[in-house]
Design a protein with these regions (language model features):
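A conserved, positively charged/aromatic
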Residues: 147-151, 261
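A short beta-strand/loop micro-motif in the catalytic core of glycosyltransferases
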Residues: 153-160, 268
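Catalytic donor nucleotide-activated moiety binding site of glycosyltransferases and closely related
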Residues: 126-133, 164-167, 208, 215-253, ...
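Donor nucleotide-activated moiety binding/catalytic core segment of transferases
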Residues: 175-183, 187, 235-238, 242-268
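Aromatic- and Gly/Pro-rich donor/ligand-binding loops
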Residues: 1-148, 195
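Conserved donor-binding/catalytic core segment of Leloir-type glycosyltransferases
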Residues: 197-210
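A donor-sugar binding/catalytic signature common to diverse glycosyltransferases
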Residues: 260-300
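Leloir-type glycosyltransferase catalytic cores
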Residues: 244, 248, 303-349
Length: 349
């Protein structure tokens, strides 16, 4: 959704964005082995042809094909550099979700644009880039290289407030905070662009990246406070479906997930983007935050809107019909959206 929203925002500015398609095949052999073991241990048939993965992600793949402009698959550094040479661009933008997290991005140099020759006159921009964890996991021996690469950027913005001093103190680079790209679009734009169905429900929508008994219990408590039921939507539950049925593991369409938040009475989620879309769609929510790492993205977003009480432990508040001032939140978001859009427009000039 970040790629989709950023492309839409850039199109509104008159640009023709293309997202570089860097397949997961470029992961290390260890990561590929771990993925095969995960699928095997959860009884999902796995084969090297990627048939299983394509089946599970078929709706996501359809969404990408229909809504996101991609480059050809770039399966090596050689292909990436050749594409760069053959397809001149005004600017390259990196962002947003955990693009600078070493554990998730083995070819991390690419995300600092090492493949762009130093003397080339192309605008290098970071939009809402994220380290993913605090403290960051970039190896100390990479500091000098990334400091040099970052100082070739014309503008740097980050998704977490905590990343601003990290960039300054460790890499000598100036940065500012901006909204996650999903929040560059409004509620009405998502409905119109994606044809979402507006059909309000009395249910609590529980969107969990990882499903646990504790999280389901919290969703149940929230639902009981609302005198209603909850509906669980969990990618992890699909990935770990038992019984050997590949069809049971197919992830629902992206639009179904968005409509779940859009039409819910309120939302319980452990996902940053579950919170983001709750705010975009004006829905009360409870955020379940993992305090063992990666919570800075939640903290930045929730504090910007003054909604600290919406973190886990305050679920009883959702029984109030005036959980937060929707108009005030919309005004705050509109201001940050304008500031974030201005950052992009200025950086691209």
């Amino acid at each position: 959704m970040q790629a989709y929203a950023l492309q839409q925002a850039l199109r509104k500015m008159g640009y023709e964005p293309v997202t570089l398609d860097i397949p997961f095949d470029r992961r290390s052999p260890l990561r590929r082995w771990a993925k095969s073991r995960l699928l095997a241990l959860t009884h999902i048939p796995y084969d090297q042809s990627k048939r299983s993965e394509r089946t599970v992600l078929q709706h996501t793949a359809r969404f990408v094909e229909q809504h996101i402009t991609l480059s050809p698959p770039l399966r090596s550094d050689t292909e990436l550099r050749e594409y760069y040479r053959q397809q001149p661009a005004h600017a390259y933008i990196v962002g947003s979700d955990q693009v600078w997290r070493q554990a998730f991005v083995p070819m991390l140099d690419d995300y600092f644009f090492r493949f762009i020759p130093e003397t080339d006159d192309v605008r290098r921009i970071a939009y809402a880039a994220s380290f993913g964890v605090d403290p960051i996991d970039i190896a100390p021996e990479r500091t000098a290289l990334y400091s040099d690469l970052l100082n070739r950027f014309v503008a740097i913005s980050v998704r977490e407030h905590s990343a601003v001093p990290i960039l300054e103190q460790r890499f000598g680079a100036s940065a500012r905070w901006v909204l996650d790209p999903t929040m560059l679009l409004t509620r009405d734009e998502y409905i119109d662009l994606l044809g979402l169905q507006v059909e309000p429900s009395s249910e609590v929508f529980a969107y969990m990246l990882t499903d646990t008994p504790h999280k389901e219990e919290l969703a149940q408590q929230v639902a009981e406070a609302q005198h209603t039921t909850y509906r669980l939507f969990s990618p992890w539950r699909h990935w770990t479906a038992r019984g050997g049925s590949l069809e049971a593991c197919i992830l629902p369409p992206v639009e179904a997930w968005l409509e779940g938040i859009l039409n819910a009475r309120c939302v319980v989620t452990d996902s940053f983007h579950g919170v983001a879309f709750s705010l975009i769609f004006g829905k009360p929510f409870v955020a379940i935050v993992n305090n063992r790492g990666g919570c800075s993205r939640f903290d930045s977003l929730i504090k910007v809107f003054g909604l600290e009480s919406h973190q886990e432990g305050a679920y009883e508040l959702v029984s109030s019909p005036q959980l937060y001032d929707v108009k005030a939140i919309a005004q705050t978001m509109a201001q940050h959206r304008a500031d974030s859009t201005d950052f992009l427009q200025t950086a691209l000039k």
